[in-house]
Amino acid sequence: MKNKKRVFIASSLSCVLLLLSAANTEANSANKDSQDQTKKEHVDKAQQKEKRNVNDKDKNTPGPDDIGKNGKVTKRTVSEYDKETNILQNLQFDFIDDPTYDKNVLLVKKQGSIHSNLKFESHRNETNASWLKYPSEYHVDFQVQRNPKTEILDQLPKNKISTAKVDSTFSYSLGGKFDSTKGIGRTSSNSYSKSISYNQQNYDTIASGKNNNRHVHWSVVANDLKYGNEIKNRNDEFLFYRNTRLSTVENPELSFASKYRYPALVRSGFNPEFLTYISNEKSNEKTRFEVTYTRNQDILKNKPGIHYGQPILEQNKDGQRFIVVYEVDWKNKTVKVVEKYSDQNKPYKEG
């Protein structure tokens, strides 16, 4: 009888252990699925925050700061989002009242987000039917519209920058003096400073050589792109390539490396921070500025299936831009949007 009880107890324990093991396996599987889902739903938090703030646009409420004894700064912020291009412009206008200077002074900080619009597409009518469109270049353009009394005197960033993070500070001192330095910080109580800071890993910032006192342009261009253990240059047709034996026309993503391994500017997008210092003759009451944000896309084309085909790379093949015209009232220190529109199939081209 005792032996039967022992057998029964042992059998019961075995069942319990099997049930616990199965439950543990199921829990681990559920946990992994949850982690994978969280990973898949990851989107650049900075961009989402920018979009939520679009409803707060046209913040034309004065916010003066002191510069020395008599200088004042009045701040305005205007945000415009374009659904068609998935681009957000967020501009900060800082009006500087300097009683020791004979001109109006304005600092314009261009922020917002240019979403990557990363796409995998199937094109059955082509041999290389699996396509990947990715953002190879981001562009920000700033122009003074037909007004000789308003001039651009300085900008940040300048020249070419290849570091993963860009940090710079512009300082304005009473009397119309200005300077810029690397890093973030304020200089003294007699000056006003404005900083920029943004990430551009695997990309380079290039200030256009055509910049002048009416026009500035910045390009943020892909260089050597790192994804997982791979590093390939933008000019390499095998960029993001994956063995295509298991891929099909119906699943173009299988012809490329997993998108969750791509650099942030490829996977999510770019959050610009560019600065322009502007002076205006006090006899001029209003000035219009045209601001353009552009996304250029390269197209990578792979042939799905077991029959190998040479990849195809087409650079700056597609692009989208969002243009906004802002009018500045120098006397009242206000800003309003007077025009805005967007274009498809309009990649930026130099010249």
From Swiss-Prot:
GO terms for biological process: cytolysis in another organism. The keyword Iron does not apply. Keywords: Signal. Residues 1-32 form the signal peptide. Coiled coil: none annotated. Residues 26-74 are annotated as: Disordered. Residues 33-60 have a biased composition (Basic and acidic residues). The keyword Cytoplasm does not apply. GO terms for cellular component: extracellular region. It holds the Pfam family Leukocidin. Belongs to the aerolysin family. This is Uncharacterized leukocidin-like protein 2.
